[in-house]
Regions:
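Anionic-ligand binding patches
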Residues: 3-7, 41-186
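N-terminal beta1-alpha1 ligand-phosphate binding loop
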Residues: 3-24
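Short linear Ser/Thr-Pro motifs
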Residues: 10-12, 31, 98
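Short, glycine/serine-rich, charged loops/turns that create anion-binding
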Residues: 13, 33, 176
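A generic short alpha-helical patch detector that favors 3-5-residue windows
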Residues: 24-25, 152
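Short glycine-rich, Thr/Ser-proximal phosphate-binding strand/loop in the N-terminal lobe
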Residues: 25-40, 116-122
Length: 186
């Protein structure tokens, strides 16, 4: 695969690992995009706007490069759950996910400075009930604090997974197959 300079506009170690399944020939430039004022009617539309904003913020400073921007949110009944800000926030999130089905939306945007394309991939996730003891033990680790919804599906949260409908890698923050197909068009 020959591609112009590919830049991942994310500091996520999981996205770096997943993009490496496609190519190891990329650099990382974390976007300085300000997410605070971004709104949208639905969580899926929000995550696409966030991915696009991150992508374009990096693309403007790297003409000629192909930039990949991503964002992931957890959606519980239409309410966006981002990354927890505290132990209590993480516990609140995990209680909301316990024994319930939620959606994970990952927005992906690619731009070469001339053309910009994006998509959202969604996955339904159902957890078994999570005991207070499990929540306490999990929130005592570092695992939940840099992840949307306060969990890492590839980590200890795998123990709570009842079922999922969709792409497992969407939950991790980069739907690899669809992203590869999009990158192949650039």
């Amino acid at each position: 695969m020959m591609m112009k300079n590919l830049i991942l506009a994310s500091g996520s170690p999981r996205r770096k690992e997943l993009l490496s399944l496609y190519t190891t020939d990329f650099t990382i430039c974390v976007s300085d995009f300000d997410e605070s004022g971004v709104t949208a009617p639905t969580p899926a539309q929000l995550v696409e706007k966030l991915a696009r904003g991150k992508c374009l913020a990096v693309a403007k400073d790297h003409p000629g490069a192909v930039v990949l921007g991503c964002d992931t949110v957890v959606d519980v009944g239409g309410e966006v759950i981002g990354k927890p800000h505290s132990v209590e926030d993480a516990k609140r999130m995990l209680r909301a996910l316990s024994g319930a089905t939620h959606e994970v939306h990952t927005g992906v945007c690619v731009s070469d400075g001339v053309r910009t394309e994006s998509f959202v991939d969604s996955c339904k996730v159902t957890f078994f009930p999570i005991s207070e003891g499990e929540i306490d033990a999990y929130t005592a680790t570092k695992e939940p604090y840099d992840k949307a919804g306060a969990y890492a599906i590839q980590g200890r949260a795998a123990l709570w997974l009842d079922r999922l409908e969709g792409d497992y890698y969407t939950i991790m923050g980069l739907p690899v197959s669809r992203t590869a197909r999009l990158l192949n068009r650039f």
